[in-house]
Amino acid sequence: MLQKNRHFKVFLNMPLEWLLLLCPFLCGGFFPWASALVGLVLIFLLLLLLRRGLLCVALSAPFLAAASVVLFHLGGIIWGTDRGMAPVGAVQFLPLPLFVLLLEQLAPERRMDLLRRLPYAASVMVLLSFLLSCIPSLGPWFLVAGRQAGFFQYPNTYALYLLFALVLVLFGAPLRFGKLPWAAAAALGILLSGSRTVFFLLLAVVLVFFFTVKSKQSRLRILIFAALLLFISVLYVLLSGNRGSVGRFLTASLTASEFVGRILYAYDALPVILRHPLGLGFTGYRCLQGSFQTGVYSVQHVHNELLQLLLDVGWIPAALFLWALWQGFRSREGGLLRKLLLAVPLLHCLLDFDTQFISVALLLFLVLDTAPQAQRKFSPNRAVRRLSAGILTVSALLCLWIGSASFLYYLRKPADALRVYPAYTAAIADLLPTASDEDLGPLADRVLRLNKAVALAHDARAKADFSAGKISAAIAHKQEAIRLCRYNLTEYLDYFDILRYARERYLQRGDTDSADSCLSLIIEIPGMLETVDAQTSRLGRIIRDKPDLTLPPPYVSWLEQHASEFVSNS
């Protein structure tokens, strides 16, 4: 029996290895439905271990960090910005603690074996992505602004994944000619992705290789290899004229709008982090972004994973994650290879949202060292095993429920997604632009009950209230929409039009007091725009998108004609 149990734990390597190989092909695991699928596989493996009485638990720093992320996402049902999307966030990151639990069943030396075939999978992705991108109907799936994005559909994280594979090739074992094709595929994929940050990280990895590898043959091979790649890249730019991918490296600058923008995102997010120790919850940053930004931008993520962690789930999970990282860097297990596999994604995560892709997050947690806690493992007793089986079963049902709704939403079927999960806030919001006049108000109310920070819902509610003659309510909702979209000039113009039309109706009814109140609010609009412009940061004036906060001439003319009326009446 003992021998069978040992064989079963060795058997874990195969499904975990295939999971790491295939997950990047599921859009990198970026969408909740992909995470739900990964979670179901991991839950099945854990239930098998529980049934055989083989599951051992170590309350390691990586496990506590991963588990806290899931628990605090669930807590967003209580304190988060969007209560409806909180369970979606929990499912999105549920694979992390499950994966760490399974890793703790393996000997430390076997964990790194899970990565041995990753360079092959990366090479296959490069080849498939290039070939499929040549098909016009499939090109948009694999290309972003002329840059190869792989199955991740995002060039920067795709490039990071390839760099991870390249590090495995260069430092995993002595570099031989047989490995050069895998290294070449990864390097070419990085160049075609046009990711400048990963390109500079690649140069740093090559320098580390030269200074740490003693074999002169290996150095010569990598030197010839790098020179050949550089020649091919320059030739490609000259012949094709395509600067959207390889050519982007020639335009790298610390003053580039993309780089300055990332600094701006962080600058705007820091005060929010200090005010919300429990985080904003899943999608909270995206919804509230317009209320605190000091420049013109619209992003789903802050492009810094530590800040994103603080924004989403608050201080405690972030502190646990930093503790796990500290232990990982202090550990001597795995040598230089593991240190590089840890450092490379972490450095890139400071400028992008890589761990939102669950496949990258799994790789990061794999190289976090859990060996020091191995001596503190314990086997749950019968009661705990039953409780654990119950929790895993509920988690599986949650994955099926949320994952199904997410997949329907991914297929652009929001109405069907809502039949599965009625609190899917994003799906309800997607129905607003095409809703009938009768449905507009109730749909907006459904969104606002779950998340009061959706500007689109406030706009819809304002439209419904205005149609029903509820002028005061319409004005209040329009003001809230402006607060959430301070740099959107269209919001101010709509607000102006509502007030102007309301004023005319009040005048027709002889209600001069209400008409004057509307006029006073209209007169305040230029001042509102000037305030936002004055609050625009220096960084906000450097990035490509500049504030457009000037009223069009017809609106200015109307103000000039009617401002004197307000002065005389007051």
Locate predicted features.
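Flexible juxtamembrane loops connecting transmembrane helices in multi-pass membrane enzymes
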Residues: 147-151, 205-206, 233-267, 408-417
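Extended, hydrophobic alpha-helical segments in both membrane/secreted and soluble proteins
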Residues: 195, 285, 305-306, 312
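Juxtamembrane loop-helix boundary motifs flanking transmembrane segments in multi-pass membrane proteins
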Residues: 106, 140-144, 258-261, 265, ...
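Transmembrane signal-anchor hairpin modules in multi-pass inner-membrane enzymes, especially those
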Residues: 1-120, 172-178, 207-224, 372-473, ...
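Short aromatic-rich membrane-water interface segments that cap or initiate transmembrane helices
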Residues: 29, 80-83, 145-158, 254, ...
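Long, contiguous interaction/recruitment modules in multidomain scaffold/adaptor proteins
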Residues: 321-414
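Alpha-helical transmembrane segments of multi-pass inner-membrane proteins
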Residues: 13-29, 37-48, 70-77, 89-102, ...
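TM-adjacent membrane-interface loops and short helices in multi-pass inner/ER membrane proteins
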Residues: 261-299, 313-319
